[in-house]
Amino acid sequence: MAVLRPFDKLPELNSATILLVGAEGGPQQQLAEAMLREKKDFNINIHLASSLPLPSERDHLRPRIDLIAFVIDIKSKYSLKNVQASLAYVDVRFFLGKVCFLVTGVGRANNCSVEMNAIWKLGEDYCSPVIFCELELEGIRVATAQRLLRMLQICAGRVPGVSALYFSLLMRNSAGD
């Protein structure tokens, strides 16, 4: 049960890796497929995990992870607890701009099982942006995929002059406005 570390491995040339953690099933898979369909000028590796830690026996085959997106389903308290438990297996250096919280199901606020304050507090405690979306709607799923790809591109160091930490600070400041 190893802790994920952001700089343990060398980056791969012309590629970036994102890890989607949480909210098992269709929406997470559909988001990954939407990301793969988008036009991009670099190779993308998408890994899906229901929770952390990742199995250590395949660690030597796993590429360097550039961005971790924790997926929280707003209608499932288990989803939030799963993400909170998984955070213990992430090295603190990932929280310097290489983590975001993706909250799904916001279109069904009347079926909400998770306190919004708990989600905002999670983002604040871990200095990471919180992104709200509805992955069941195609248009919003595509927009979310594009946004995550741009974040991944920045986190992988593929945008000159913009670091992951700087971008994360910009996102956090704009969320408070």
From Swiss-Prot:
Signal peptide: none annotated. Transmembrane segments: none annotated. Keywords: Centromere, Chromosome, Nucleus. One of its GO terms (cellular component) is chromosome, centromeric region. It is found in: Nucleus; Chromosome, Centromere. Its main location: nucleus. Component of the CENPA-HI complex, a centromeric complex involved in assembly of kinetochore proteins, mitotic progression and chromosome segregation. Component of the CENPA-HI complex, at least composed of CENPH, CENPI, CENPK, CENPL, CENPM, CENPO and CENPP. This is Centromere protein M. It comes from Gallus gallus.
